[in-house]
Amino acid sequence: MAGKLVSLVPPLLLAAAGLTGLLLLCVPTQDVREPPALKYGIVLDAGSSHTSMFVYKWPADKENDTGIVGQHSSCDVQGGGISSYANDPSKAGQSLVRCLEQALRDVPRDRHASTPLYLGATAGMRPFNLTSPEATARVLEAVTQTLTQYPFDFRGARILSGQDEGVFGWVTANYLLENFIKYGWVGRWIRPRKGTLGAMDLGGASTQITFETTSPSEDPGNEVHLRLYGQHYRVYTHSFLCYGRDQILLRLLASALQIHRFHPCWPKGYSTQVLLQEVYQSPCTMGQRPRAFNGSAIVSLSGTSNATLCRDLVSRLFNISSCPFSQCSFNGVFQPPVAGNFIAFSAFYYTVDFLTTVMGLPVGTLKQLEEATEITCNQTWTELQARVPGQKTRLADYCAVAMFIHQLLSRGYHFDERSFREVVFQKKAADTAVGWALGYMLNLTNLIPADLPGLRKGTHFSSWVALLLLFTVLILAALVLLLRQVRSAKSPGAL
């Protein structure tokens, strides 16, 4: 008798497993879509010296999640920034054609119409808009005319404020490094315990510093409140116009012409012909323009590899004696103490990369950065060319930019040896260029929600059907086994 009962256990277990599985499959659920195709977005970063195009991509059903938007491709527009075409605005639009044609190839044809296309102009256009608003409008109109000829979903060309540029760069860096939220190994969205990191951007016409702070701002214009993924962030940000790489070089050139008649930041043995109109036509150098000014005059200027005089020239760029607040960075601008980790990108990265890779010098501390800068500034033109044969573009300017970066960080932003150790100089994060462009697109396409994304589990339809068949087979197999056991028990030879 006991043997008969034991023989019924396997089919009964199979039947129980099958019935349990069927019951679970019949529990009301929500439909889950199949893995979606990718969606795309395009941002044209119209900087002061050049324009760059970035194509981003993300899964089409993840519009309110994170950690999923990445860079698909990029393209550098040939020629100068769009503000350089003020005298012939049509060329501003024409300059974008090569990169837009690349975008047509990079984005699948069936996604063209649904791909948002943005153009954001930064510090190069801000002063231009103040001095020549009509010319600015003509340039933006010409650019818009070109962009609307393409099958993308063009959503406008606008001039970003300095605050926008700083905040969007901060959002980009922290988004890519998953400092807001990340998908954990437990299969759900979690908020990382690490805090956000500050962002420092050195463009062609301006520089930005942005970081989260607990200190209330004494200047409301430098404080931004953000709500991302259910978390509130108080962010300090400031953009210094005319403190970008290209404008700093122009201002130093104007000072060298006025004070020395030689350039202490240029390497000895390097000389060039300087057209005065090109020096003083910028809004950033108008204040240095001599009264007796002949724009068509050409002046010959030579370098002297003098680190000491170069430092003195750069120090004139910073006014640290006047501060109407309890604490300032420079030029009377309020700034709370820097705190936490920072990422420095754009010209910050390229300059420090030159010091470490080409010059072979360490820059892990402020003191090392100062020493590396001084060594670079004391190099002759022949010595510099020997390090990078065939490269002459920008080679003579690394001393001046490195000197500016050191003084900006130490005297301007007040980094000390301890806080400087928390600064990393980086070009990309998660294979995506760090800059304001991604943060700008994330904001305009609502890809970052204000509240934490919810979690929903589901099963693909094909998997559901397979499980249904499996559990049905289990029940049928159990029934067959039960029938065989019953027949076996009823047979005349059964004990």
Curated annotation (Swiss-Prot):
One of its GO terms (cellular component) is cell body. Disulfide bonds join 75-99, 242-284, 265-310, 323-328, 377-399. The keyword Flavoprotein does not apply. The chain crosses the membrane at residues 5-25, 463-483. GO terms for biological process: cellular response to interferon-alpha; cellular response to interleukin-6; cellular response to lipopolysaccharide; cellular response to tumor necrosis factor; G protein-coupled receptor signaling pathway; nucleoside diphosphate catabolic process; platelet activation; purine ribonucleoside diphosphate catabolic process. Residues 1-4, 484-495 are cytoplasmic. Its EC number is 3.6.1.-. Its cofactor is Ca(2+); Mg(2+). Pfam families: GDA1_CD39 (PF01150). This is Ectonucleoside triphosphate diphosphohydrolase 2. The lineage of its organism: Eukaryota, Metazoa, Chordata, Craniata, Vertebrata.
